[in-house]
């Protein structure tokens, strides 16, 4: 059964790092030959500077939904330019909003808002989604300066709580990445978030894919969300 109260927990992965977005590659042009196979580029891609630019400028993208539920929606992330305090020290913040209109589902619409907090270099520090989760990185996340196809790594672990008092734990998100082939001049950065409940059981895996070029421009491709444990819900958001 689709559970709207849980949805922001996993979609917010996009909020917490990189903004969000199965590589169902953008429908290629007409003609009949289908989509060409991916190419392993030999270029180096500036992942860190591309990420910083994306966070600093904000973005808004529409998407379609397939899988257990179908529909469409929008994800808007405001530029992280609001000075504030997070966990007792200076931070920059930006708000992110998800809206979804659903069919063939137990709910017809969803909407959620979260605020993500960054240091002065746009390194993510945590987030707060009222009524859902308060997340804090256990240590500063590691985002590589440059990557190549085939690279993998762990970015960080985010502790989740029910609210900012941090008195009740609500699990963890473990974030990693894989750089996948795409074209001779681009690659796909696959951000993988594994969400665990407070008992340490895996409850969902989200894969957010972005296309990156040699200049560091990041373009959302899709988000693939697979629930587990008490649900078999599978959602694919294609941007």
Q: Where do the PLM segments sit?
A:
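A short, surface-exposed beta-strand/turn
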Residues: 104-127, 182, 202-219
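Edge beta-strand at a domain terminus
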Residues: 77, 135-142, 173, 206-209, ...
């Amino acid at each position: 059964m689709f559970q709207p109260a849980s949805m922001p927990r996993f979609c917010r992965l996009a909020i917490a790092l990189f903004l969000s977005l199965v590589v169902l590659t953008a429908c290629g042009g007409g003609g009949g030959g289908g989509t060409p196979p991916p190419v392993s580029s030999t270029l180096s891609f500036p992942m860190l500077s591309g990420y910083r630019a994306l966070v600093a400028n904000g973005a808004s993208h529409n998407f379609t939904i397939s899988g257990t539920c179908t529909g469409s929606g929008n994800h808007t992330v405001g530029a992280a330019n609001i000075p504030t305090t997070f966990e007792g020290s200076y931070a920059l913040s930006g708000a992110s909003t998800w809206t979804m209109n659903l069919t063939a589902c137990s709910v017809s619409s969803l909407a959620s808002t979260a605020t993500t907090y960054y240091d002065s270099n746009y390194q993510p520090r945590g987030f707060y989604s009222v009524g859902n989760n308060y997340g804090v990185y256990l240590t500063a996340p590691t985002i590589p300066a440059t990557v190549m196809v085939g690279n993998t790594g762990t970015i960080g672990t985010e502790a989740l709580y029910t609210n900012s008092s941090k008195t009740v734990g609500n699990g963890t998100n473990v974030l990693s990445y894989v750089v996948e082939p795409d074209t001779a001049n681009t690659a796909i950065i696959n951000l993988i978030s594994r969400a665990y409940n407070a008992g340490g059981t895996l409850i969902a895996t989200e894969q957010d894919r972005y296309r990156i070029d040699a200049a560091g421009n990041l373009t959302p491709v899709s988000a693939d969300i697979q629930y587990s444990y008490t649900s078999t819900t599978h959602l694919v958001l294609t941007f």
